[in-house]
Regions:
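Extracytoplasmic
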Residues: 58-60, 78, 87, 109, ...
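Bacterial N-terminal signal peptides
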Residues: 10-21
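Short secondary-structure boundary/capping segments
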Residues: 54-55, 82, 153-155
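Short beta-strand segments
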Residues: 61-96, 124
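Bacterial Sec-dependent signal peptides at the C-terminal "C-region" and cleavage site
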Residues: 20-28
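Short, conserved active-site entrance elements at the starts or edges of catalytic domains
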Residues: 27-76
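Short, structured beta-strand-loop surface elements
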Residues: 29-47, 97-170
Length: 170
């Protein structure tokens, strides 16, 4: 590859591979490429939360998620949700299940930001359907034991909408 190729030239090549005309520099294809480039490749480990940041988020219990909108640039409306920590990872669930608008956006866009404990962090979102869900149920049960909403968040509808939130490298 010629090292003198500009970023624009590379974008044109990628757009051509995706089936877009080189003069079709619409915001969405470029944004999707930029977003994909910011994601770790499949099988590559995501950066972990710093222990102090994760504990501040869990303790504050004021997490708001803002997955990107369909344009891949605009953050969605911050939505307050419960969160738990299991094995150093931050998990959330959509109480109303996979039809929840924030959940749908998080799974579709795979990125956005969170606001919690006085911090704003760009993050990735990934659905979690593995065996860790039993431990996530236990973490929710322990943290929110006095809430009348506990049974809903550990029920099958919410469990099917479990998301792991990972910080993007800073």
């Amino acid at each position: 590859m010629n090292k003198s190729l500009s970023k624009t030239s590379v974008a044109v090549v990628f757009l051509a591979v995706l089936g877009c005309a080189p003069n079709a520099f619409a915001a969405e294809p470029v944004t999707r490429l930029q977003q994909a480039a910011s994601q770790p490749a499949p099988g590559v480990q995501h950066p972990a939360w710093k222990a102090d940041e994760l504990q501040r988020i869990i303790k504050a219990d004021d997490l708001k998620v803002s997955p990107f909108r369909e344009d891949g640039v605009t953050f969605g409306t911050p939505t307050w949700i419960w969160c738990v920590e299991v094995d150093g990872k931050l998990y959330v669930r959509a109480y109303s299940g996979t039809s929840s608008s924030w959940y749908s956006a998080a799974v579709r866009e795979k990125a956005g930001r969170i606001i919690a404990a006085g911090m704003t962090r760009e993050v990735t979102f990934a659905p979690e359907q593995g065996s860790v869900n039993q431990r996530i149920d236990e973490a929710y049960s322990q943290k929110y034991s006095s809430s009348p909403y506990l049974q809903g968040i550990i029920g099958e509808q919410a469990r099917s909408a479990t998301v792991v939130i990972t910080p993007k490298a800073q």
